[in-house]
C-alpha cells in the first residue's frame, strides 16, 4: 500500500473517531534584524521621552512605582505564551458544551486557580522579602533602580536577539496527569500554586527576573508579596477567557499566531521601562 493510501486511511479513521485539529501551515515568524534593531531604538527613545515627561508630572518615586506595576502586570500576561500558559488555558476549561450551567460548574475551578496563585505569591514573595530584609534592607533605593534598569535593558536586547543573557529556568511543565486523579477545582488549585511560584515551571518572559529582583532588593516582606502578587494577577487573568464561548482551538491558534509578537512586546517593554527608569534617576 502506498504512503498516500495509508495517510488517507488514517485520516478517515480519525474522522470516524474524534474530531481532529487541522495542521497549521503558517507560523509566527521573527522580523528581520534591521526591523528588530529599529524597534529596539524606538523603545529606548520612547522610554527616555516618557521618563522626561513623567519627571515633570510627578515625583520620581511615584513614576517608578507606576512603571513597575505596568511592567509586572504586562509580564504576567506575556507569560501566557509559555508552555504552561498554553496548557492552563487548554486544560482548565468548562466540561461539555458551553452553557450557563457548564460555566457555573466550572467557576470554582477558576477561583481555586486564583487562590493557588495567591498562595504562590505569599510563599515566593515572603521568601524573597525575608531574604532581602536580612541582606539588602540598607541598600539605597537609587542603586536598586539603577541595577534593575540596566538588567531590563540587557534582557530587552536579549528578547530582540542582539544580546545573550543568562536564562535560568526549570524546564518543567504542569503535571497533565493530575486531571485524571483530581476533581477540576483541585487541579485549578494545584496548577495555580505551581504557576504562582513562577520557578517551578518554565516561564517565557525575562520580566520575571526584574520582578524577582525588585521583590528581593525592596527589603520588605509585605512589599515583596505584593510585587509577586501583581505579576501573578497578570498570569491568572487570561484563564478567565474560558468564561466566554470561545473554543479551545481558537485560543491556541491565536496564541501561536502572536508568539513572536509577544516576544517583541516583551523586549519593547523592558527597554522602554529600563530607559525611563534611568532617565528618572538622572533628572
Curated annotation (Swiss-Prot):
Its main location: membrane. The chain crosses the membrane at residues 37-57, 58-78, 116-136, 143-163, 187-207, 210-230, 263-283. GO terms for cellular component: plasma membrane. It is found in: Cell membrane. Pathway: One-carbon metabolism; methylamine degradation. Keywords: Cell membrane, Membrane, Transmembrane, Transmembrane helix. Signal peptide: none annotated. It is a multi-pass membrane protein. This is Methylamine utilization protein MauF. It comes from Methylobacillus flagellatus (strain ATCC 51484 / DSM 6875 / VKM B-1610 / KT).
